[in-house]
Design a protein with these regions (language model features):
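Electropositive polyanion-binding surfaces
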Residues: 384-386, 411-414, 429, 433, ...
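Beta-strand cores of modular interaction/reader domains in eukaryotic scaffold and signaling proteins
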Residues: 54-55, 77, 155-157, 173, ...
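Noncatalytic, typically N-terminal accessory segments of nucleic acid-processing enzymes
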Residues: 1-217
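Core residues of folded domains in eukaryotic genome-function proteins
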Residues: 50-58, 72-74, 152-155, 159, ...
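Short coil/turn segments at secondary-structure boundaries
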Residues: 66-69, 89-91, 168-171, 179, ...
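Charge-lined substrate channels and their catalytic hotspots, especially those that engage the 3′ end
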Residues: 199-496, 502-541, 873, 879-892, ...
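Eukaryotic short linear interaction motifs
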Residues: 62-64, 69-72, 83-88, 94, ...
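Structured beta-strand/turn binding interfaces of compact recognition modules in eukaryotic regulators
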Residues: 57-64, 79-81, 157-159, 177, ...
């Protein structure tokens, strides 16, 4: 049966055109119920013992997905009209529902009501799309009732009063979410139910029992129409809000319209915005802007703490450019400072797109009696200090007080000091190492599930070995006769020989994006048979590789470069320590050791040449733990030692990445995946310049060459070559005009993409279709994180790929850091110690120190926390010094001090490492 859909649209050229689409209807679409006597039961997904089959409307799925994911909710028919609406409204929820539908252990069935002759409905004249879709849901529910008869009850679940009223009038069984959940006899499930806004908990009952305290706390958000108009007129400014990780009362919004970051100070000015929200901001009058000063943040926060009855554990200053405004600081006693040095400050007037998701943390008991029916109200405190407390209601308060739990945000009324949310699930006991490690993974959206059977089926059977087909492949060079040894050389495992585009293995790798390295474990991007066997370049074992081969002069000048897929047989698999020991042992003169020394000599010349071009040679503190093999607790902590062998490998890997970047860009100028490092702005470097000046150094920051030994805060990112002009390809830190990632396809999906591009440039294989077809969206877009806020508009593969990979790369880094922080807390809780530290930043009530022995950076307070140091301590900004008013004691930037490190818990369930001056 054929139906025609027609509509008119406006083209980009401004023309109006009529579009006609054919819509085919069928009468042989299965219902999915085993009890059916008409349909083919081999296609049944629902339980044969089901007494009730649920049909959910769109808003129920949108708002109750946490409940729906609970195993108690099963035997569900998911209508295609609901899926279509979800795809347009919330891709994250859409993907979660699709996962339920494809899960072999859940009983969810997708019914294509929009393509069934008896359930498709046309929109009536004057009927809104929402009303038409509600009617389609009721029609499909009625069809199921007639189709299955008395064999099973069909129940429509909806919280829409009008939809429920019409359903009952039409003879359909219908219930609200709460009513149905109560009928299940599992009271704990009610904690998962999101209350409709109109039925939310009364503010008086939760926040204050005195009606006089009920007042408007936040300004009303502007409607989108007013926000859009204000953005066009330049009254409002759009950007992503980022909350200071160490001061949750301070945030900033990067604004392209004014070319600067707008400081948002205080919860009132944040106006219910969460970290990561896309917001509209209105600038405050200039006399209210904050002036850049080296002042105490904690003191200013204290004013807000008293004003808002909060009790946050606020650190002295942020220590990452990702966590705080570039030059943000609060206005201090010198209020008459020149406004020329003030930073733009503003307030949030509207939320353009929310970044709400689930959060890990614990409950803070509230001095309120349990409600009727055992309902208790509690405040949830997130592990992420940037997130405000969230109020929830629960029927299992006693079981949750000592647990790490997950809570989702539902709403935030302007009459409420806190947002409202609901309990999702329990992670485990507070303080348990496994529980806290799982929190790290959840907070950073790390996929640690086991590889599915479909993914593992893509792997070749073990034991695997190089076959005669590989050796006879004209596109693969036999290098087994060449002396090859692995200290991670330019011969890179040929991962793409086993990871083919469009397979479940490739889909899984693309969604994971990268391997994640925690202190006690590694979460692989690819299954272990590949990472630890088939693609591991072992000694005396034949392996497939993708090789970069250079011809070089003794001065490390590259004469020629070629690339080939190869077969190698490594004569040695050396660790960095083993390679260094060989090079250092003058008694060894064997060919392998001689090769190592020759390569090291070349690497030194290559490194010097990079430095001469202006490459930055900055070392970051990498902490190394000694872990107990039985308890997995840290036994010792120290800095990771970098050897010449590490630098040798680094140079050849960098050279390989540069060579591959040049090759793929030459062949695919518009669709190469490259990596760039933007040049930092002067504002980013101001703190460095002040510090250098204080110790008598005058830095020239006009070029990377002049700034080769300085810090910068720009972050290297992936990008598609077709999206930027060639001058923007620059990798500032490496002083390389072109750069990509090729050398680690085992642990980075970016390298897998580059391998495919390189193979296509060599005509070894065809370029995957998706690389050429820019409007296509791949399964990568279906991953949860690509659905956050600013990525929802992405509709092109090459638009989404770099953004997604950058997101995954950053999350992996943040998870690694969080794991280090967790194990640092575990270690110093048992081993408090005294050690040396170097002052790196000065503040009026203390300073930030770096502890070289442990790679730790943190605040040291000279005054009581909350005291801004006024009177007793004075800051000399010119000399980067904090001193007593009488001049008897002073501390300077880069000065060594002795400190005490110990773990304290100023707030329940929030342990932190405290640094105290001795």
């Amino acid at each position: 049966m054929l139906q025609n859909k027609s509509y008119v649209r406006k083209t980009r050229a401004g023309k109006i055109e009529k579009v006609v689409k054919e819509h085919y209807l069928r009468d042989d679409i299965y219902c999915g119920a085993p009890a059916c006597t008409v349909c083919d039961t081999s296609a049944a997904r629902l339980s044969p013992n089901a007494s009730t089959i649920l049909v959910l409307d769109t808003n129920v799925v949108l708002n109750q997905i946490d409940l729906i994911e609970n195993p108690a909710i099963d035997n569900v028919v998911v209508l295609s009209v609901v899926l279509d609406e979800l795809r347009n409204k919330n891709l994250s929820v859409y993907n979660r529902l699709r996962a339920l539908c494809s899960s072999p252990v859940r009983k969810f069935f997708v019914f294509s009501n929009e393509h069934h002759r008896d359930t498709y409905v046309k929109a009536m004249v004057g009927e809104s799309p929402n009303d038409r879709n509600d009617r389609a849901i009721r029609v499909a529910t009625q069809w199921y009732q007639r189709h299955l008869g008395s064999a099973v009850r069909i129940l429509l679940i909806t919280n829409d009063r009008e939809n429920k009223r019409k359903a009952v009038e039409e003879g359909i069984f219908a219930e609200t979410v709460e009513s149905y959940v109560k009928s299940l006899g599992q009271p704990q499930l009610l904690d998962l139910v999101v209350q409709p806004a109109s039925e939310d908990v009364v503010m008086d009952d939760v926040e204050d029992l005195r009606p006089s305290k009920k007042k408007i706390i936040y300004s009303e958000h502007k409607p989108m129409s007013e926000i859009t108009a204000g953005l066009h007129r330049g009254i409002y400014h759009q950007g992503k809000l980022r909350v200071n990780r160490y001061n949750s009362f301070e945030a900033y919004v990067g604004s392209e319209s004014i070319g600067d970051e707008i400081i948002i100070y205080g919860r009132t000015n944040m106006n219910r915005a969460f970290d990561g929200d896309i917001v509209a901001v209105e600038l405050l009058p200039q006399d209210q802007w904050h002036v850049e000063k080296a002042l105490s943040i904690a003191a200013e926060v204290g004013n807000y703490l008293r004003a808002e009855d909060e009790d946050e554990d606020v650190h002295l200053v942020p220590n990452s450019s990702d966590d705080a405004p570039r030059n943000a600081s609060v206005q201090g006693p010198n209020a008459d400072a020149s406004l020329n040095s003030a930073r733009p400050s503003g307030r949030v007037v509207g939320i353009i797109k929310r970044n709400w998701h689930s959060y890990c943390g614990s409950l803070e008991p509230m001095p309120l009696p349990a409600g009727i029916g055992g309902i208790a109200h509690a405040l949830f405190v997130s592990k992420d200090r940037r997130i405000p407390k969230i109020r929830i209601q629960t029927r299992q308060l006693g079981n949750l007080l000592d647990k790490r739990i997950i809570v989702a945000v539902d709403s935030w009324d302007r009459l409420s000091r806190y947002p409202s949310g609901h309990y999702v699930r329990t992670i485990g006991e507070i303080g348990d190492r496994n529980t806290e490690s799982e929190v790290v993974l959840i907070e950073n959206d790390i996929n640690c599930r086991l590889f599915s059977a479909q993914v593992l089926a893509c792997l070749p059977p073990l034991p695997w070995s190089v076959s005669s087909e590989h050796l006879s492949d004209p596109n693969r060079e036999d290098l087994r006769h060449v002396r090859v040894f692995s200290v991670d050389p330019p011969d890179i495992a040929d991962v793409t020989n086993f990871v083919h585009p469009g397979t479940p293995l490739d889909d899984e790798a693309s969604q994971r994006g990268t391997s994640v390295y925690l202190v006690e474990r590694r979460i692989d991007m690819l299954p272990k048979p590949l990472t630890e066997d088939i693609c591991s370049l072992r000694s005396d074992v034949e392996r497939l590789a993708f090789s970069v081969i250079w011809e070089m002069t003794p001065e490390a000048d590259i004469i020629s470069t070629r690339f080939t897929k190869s077969v190698i047989k490594s004569c040695a698999a050396l660790s960095y320590v083993e390679a260094q020991a060989r090079m250092d042992d003058s008694r060894l003169v064997d060919p392998l050791t001689t090769d190592l020394r020759n390569m090291n000599a070349l690497a030194k010349k290559m490194r010097q040449r990079r430095i001469d071009r202006g490459a930055l040679t900055l070392a970051s503190a990498e902490v190394k733990f000694q872990i107990d093999t039985e308890t997995h607790d840290p036994l010792d902590i120290g800095m990771y030692q970098i050897r010449e062998a590490n630098q040798m490998v680094e140079e050849f890997m960098l050279a390989a990445n540069v060579s591959v970047a040049e090759k793929i860009l030459k062949h695919f100028p518009f669709c190469s995946l490259l990596r760039r490092h933007p040049t930092p702005t002067r504002e980013m470097l101001e703190p460095l310049l002040r510090t250098a000046a204080a110790v008598g150094l005058d830095l020239d920051i006009s070029s990377s060459k002049a700034l080769a030994d300085s810090l910068d805060r720009a972050v290297a990112v992936y990008f598609c070559s077709g999206d930027l002009s060639p001058p923007e390809y620059l990798h500032y830190g490496l002083a390389a005009p072109l750069y990509t990632h090729f050398t680690s396809p085992i642990r980075r999906y970016a390298d897998v993409i580059v391998h495919r591009l390189l193979a296509a440039s060599l005509e070894i294989s065809k370029l995957p279709t998706v690389f050429q077809d820019r409007p296509q969206l791949t399964s990568i877009a279906d991953s949860k994180d690509v659905l956050h806020n600013d990525l929802l508009h992405v509709t092109k593969f090459w638009d989404i790929m770099p953004v997604y990979l950058n997101y995954r790369h950053r999350n992996a880094q943040m998870a690694s850091r969080a794991s280090v922080e967790l194990h640092t807390i575990i270690y110093f809780r048992k081993h408090p110690t005294d050690t040396e530290a170097r002052i790196v930043k000065i503040r009026s009530n203390g300073f930030i120190v770096f502890v070289p022995k442990y790679g730790i950076e943190g605040p040291v307070y000279l005054t009581a926390k909350g005291d801004n140091g006024g009177g007793e301590w004075v800051v000399d900004e010119q000399h980067q010094q904090v001193k007593k008013a009488d001049g008897s004691v002073s501390y300077n930037v880069l000065q060594m001090v002795r400190i005490h490190l110990e773990v304290v818990e100023p707030q329940p369930n929030r342990p932190k490492l405290q640094l105290t001056l001795i």
